[in-house]
Regions:
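Flexible loop/turn connectors
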Residues: 231-341
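Hinge/beta->alpha junction and helix N-cap segments in small-molecule ligand-binding domains
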Residues: 68-81, 99-107, 162-172, 188-233, ...
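N-terminal helix-turn-helix/winged-helix DNA-binding helices
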Residues: 3, 42-77
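Central regulatory/effector-binding core of bacterial HTH transcription factors
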Residues: 83, 87-126, 130
Length: 341
């Protein structure tokens, strides 16, 4: 019986589509994976069939992977700016890009696997990084070329990623509040499973320790989605006798939610509570008062992600690069010294 592509895939521990793309010397497959697959092909005596080949377009395609919308609390203009940066760079280099999303990780993964099986993408850009991510694990285990926007949660040395120094940004944001006179500074963010939020929280804690303040977990409110029952926890924190006079918030959209919640409680921003947020998205400018926010330059994150993806498609033997994009604080109207200062 003739050896099939499925036999090779099973022996090599990869998918049939990976074997197919190895036969075509696709740059989206890592050198190590290609060598392993070719070794198994030789051992089994597999002969690829090139009689039916898809017509390749001159343009190559990059898949842009968004977070699953069911779990995401920070999907907003931030991602649109990243995609705008990716699109701008891809247009300059005559690459096509396509957006991949779904209601949960399984749906996103299914869409990616379908693209891979049909050889519809030469590389992927993952717009988020979280712990125990099945999408990142699939891309890594299949040896597929991918770039992560955010710090890699696993195999960081072998992963191409573009990020900000989120710990430093969190520290500088908390420093700003401390220098304004605040000593009771709280934190409101998304789950620590999202690495950007975990790093910003770590920076916030580093700032407090640097200034001789012991961080308290009861001063940190973290949620997975806006549907979480967080309001009672937030209310208890903001109405306590020793309530915080300032709060660091991991994202602009959560900061808008916080402003609205303060209004319900009869608290005024910034007189009763100063707020520093992140991303400098449209939300930070259309709310009242406008948010003091850390600009993490999402457009440049997108440009760099596209640049590295294309660079590695065209030069598959390059080592995994890591690029840190700078940040800067944008002071606006949501901060002032605490009442006692």
């Amino acid at each position: 019986m003739a050896v099939t592509i499925k036999d090779v895939a099973a022996a090599a521990g990869v998918s049939p589509s990976t074997v197919s793309r190895t036969c075509k010397d696709s740059p989206s497959i890592s050198r190590d994976t290609k060598e392993r697959v070719r070794r198994i092909m030789a051992q089994l005596g597999y002969e690829p069939n090139f009689e039916v080949e898809p017509v390749e377009a001159f343009s190559k395609t990059i898949g842009i992977i968004l977070p699953s919308s069911q779990r995401d609390v920070y999907e907003n203009a931030f991602h649109l700016e990243i995609i705008r940066g990716i699109g701008q760079f891809c247009n300059q280099r005559r690459y096509v890009n396509t957006v991949i999303t779904g209601q949960d990780d399984a749906e996103v993964l299914d869409a990616i696997q379908s693209m891979v099986a049909n050889a519809q993408a030469d590389g992927f850009i993952l717009l988020y990084s979280k712990k125990d991510c099945p999408v990142a694990a699939y891309l890594r285990n299949e040896g597929l070329l991918h770039v992560i926007v955010g710090k890699a949660a696993q195999s960081a040395n072998q992963t191409i990623y573009i990020d900000n120094d989120n710990a430093l940004a969190g520290e500088e944001a908390a420093d700003y509040l401390y220098e304004m006179g605040h000593r009771r500074i709280a934190y409101f963010g998304v789950s620590n499973a999202m690495l950007f939020s975990a790093e910003r929280k770590r920076g916030y804690q580093m700032s407090l320790l640097k200034h001789g303040i012991t961080p308290r977990e009861e001063d940190c409110v973290e949620i997975d989605t806006l549907n979480d029952a967080y309001e009672e926890t937030l209310k208890a924190l903001l109405t306590a006798p020793d309530r915080p006079t300032a709060m660091l918030v991991s994202d602009d959209i959560l900061a808008v939610v916080l402003e609205q919640f303060c209004d319900k409680l009869g608290l005024h921003v910034p007189k009763d509570l100063s707020i520093v947020s992140f991303n400098n998205s449209l939300f930070s400018r259309i709310t009242s008062p406008q948010l003091t926010t850390m600009d993490v330059n999402p457009y440049q994150l997108g440009m760099e992600a596209a640049s590295q993806t294309i660079n590695h498609i065209e030069n598959p033997n390059l080592l995994a690069t890591k690029i840190i994009v700078p940040h800067r604080l944008i002071p606006r109207e949501s901060c002032c010294p605490p009442p006692e200062v």
